[in-house]
Structures are given as structure tokens and as C-alpha cells.
């Protein structure tokens, strides 16, 4: 299709859709002075009636917004607000960790933002997470439904921002978004062949500690626990012999296996499954979380986002949501993608680049599980297992495959990039710029 025809189609799309304009945010409560980066917030309506209103934060690259990659960031959950990514993992701002005193929590600049080299759309999805809302009662959604909604969001967002149509585009996320991101890449790839959609310059995707096939992956928690000296050799050998590798969907008649799995849980239930070296404090109720807990900033972000001056600064629609919840697990949701491995296979066939990384202290999604499904894709190795370095020190290990997929561990990392944001940022910046890790 010629560029002129594409431009004409884009004009027709703009004229046939009512798309709300985003708002430029120059100041945020809690941050001293004007923001040192360009921030836009806004809503994109989804569906014919646009009852679903997806809220986004868009931050331009510090380097060269006109040419740097454009990425969309999706947090996991499902139901976790993208502010978790922006404030805790890869954004230019973070919350100052001090005891809440009733005033607006303070924000500080970070040194590890991925916006150093990329334009990032942080998206609250599914509807009900963060500031995204529905004009009608929220209906049950699903993995496949969200994939289509996010694709529609991107098409409409690019109608509003046609200057980014030519930028290299990547889909990025972690944890549960491991089910969404590969399917979204596949959906975008298909959509690019339809004449009446604005083409998206899709180049690849990035996933951190992704859930890919939970029934398969959770069986790697016991080998991981043994490798980390959390269970004894004797218990591990008995588990292997009696359970035969199936530890979490055990036949009720296999009483011996059930008993052994119970012993495993006695050894590990009081360990922080997202990072084995961090104290296991209760973060389930953020309103009563202890200031000594590593996750105390989760309370601070809820205090910040529930402040009326913050909502006004972000141009949140008044009355659109009640209490802002960082990780909203009450959203009606069906996990209808059992495994995202077939999507990884299709994306590899279509030639898209990918970076899959794992913090090596995560029990929830052990790095061995990720290595196993990558191996099942059956691509040859072109750069074998080796350390990747930062300032002369080993930051992790990496391996690259012939399908343009790079796997990397983050030494000392956990379930998300928040545990080692500096190292994760360097890894991302090297990969996105085409450099070897």
C-alpha cells in the first residue's frame, strides 16, 4: 500500500472516530517543580459505544522521541495498575519511602527510567484497574477479549498521535502479562494486513518473569526450591520418585505425594515467593502494611493516587472511579488462554525480536520454567550461555536463539524489575538498541 493511500485512510479514520484529546501534565503533587520529562495522560474509548475508557500515561523519550522506539507497558495481575510499572519498575519517577503523614507522598526522579531511550505508553488494563473505567456496569472480560481491546486502543492512540506511526513498536510487560503480550503481538501482526487499520511498525516484545503455561510452570517450583537449598535432598528425591514431576495437580489417591507436597509447603510457605531474600511481610492489606515492610510503598502509591489534587493533575474524569487500588483482584475475569507458547511460536515464525528475562530469586515463576518452554520452541542457539556484565561485574546470564529470542537472567532479581531496576534498565537499553547484552 502506498504511503499516500495509507495517509488518506488515516484521515478517514480520524474523521470517522470521536477520539478524546490527551492532556499535558507539567506538574504533579508530591514532586518539586516542573516535571523534567513530557507527560501526557488521557482516555481512549473502546467498543462501538466506547463504554470502556482505558486510561493511559504517555512519557516521551529523553533522547529522540521522533525516532526512538515506542513501547506499550502492560502490568500483570490481571488488575494491577500500570503505576506499579511507572513508579516501581521502569519509569522516571518513584515514591520517596517514608512513613505516611497524611500529606501527599513525595515523588523523586529516578536514574533507571526506560524512557531514557524509548517512548512509553503505560496502560491501565483491564477496565477496572487503575483509573480505567466503564460507563456501564463492568462485564466479565478475558485474556482474548483484552487482547482485542488493547489492539483497538493502540489503533486509536496512533490516530491521535500519527507522528509515532513510523517509530519501531514493541509490546512490553511482566508476570501475568505473559499471557497477554504474545497474543497481542500476534493480533497486531494480523491487523497490519488489514487495509483499513493504521499500520503499526511492530518489531518485537519484551517479557519479565512471564506466566506462560501455569500448569506446566508451577511444577518447576520444587526443583527451584531444591536448587536454592530450601528443601532437603531427601525430600526432593522422594518428591521426584513418588510424584513423578507432577506436584500441583496431584491425583487425590496418591496420598504419599500429597504428604510430600505438604512437607514442601512447610519449608517454603513463609518465604517471600516473589523474592526469596526479602522478608516475607504481609502486603495483602496495604492500608495496614508495616513501614518496615519492603512493600510499604504500595501503601504510599494508593495514598497518592487517591488524593483529589493528584486526580485533578492527572485529568482523571471526576466520579469515574471510587477508591484507587494498586492491584485490583476483584475484576470479573476469565483466563481463557491456557498457554501462550503457540503465540511465541507464531511470533518467531513472523520474525519478531523478543527479550525474555527472569529474576533468579523468584519462586512464583522460576527461571527454569521459562528456560524449559523456550527450549520447547526448538530453535538453535546462536550465542550460548554466558554472563552479561555491568561495570565489570556479572549482572546475570544470557543466551540467544536463531528465532531472534534472547533469554537473560537478572542475578539477584525477583518476580518484577522493581527489585533491581538499574540492572533491568541497562539490560533493556542494550537490547532495544540492538547491542548484545
From Swiss-Prot:
InterPro entries: AB_hydrolase_fold, Peptidase_S10
One Pfam family in the UniProt entry: Peptidase_S10
GO BP annotation list: proteolysis
Disruption phenotype: Decreased levels of 1,2-disinapoyl-glucose due to a partial redundancy with SCPL8 and SCPL13.
Class of enzymatic activity (EC top level): transferase
Disulfides per UniProt: 243-257, 281-293
Keyword Disulfide bond: yes
Position of the signal peptide: 1-21
Gene Ontology cellular component terms for the protein in this record: extracellular region
Enzyme Commission code: 2.3.1.103
Protein name, entry field: Serine carboxypeptidase-like 9
Gene name per UniProt: SCPL9
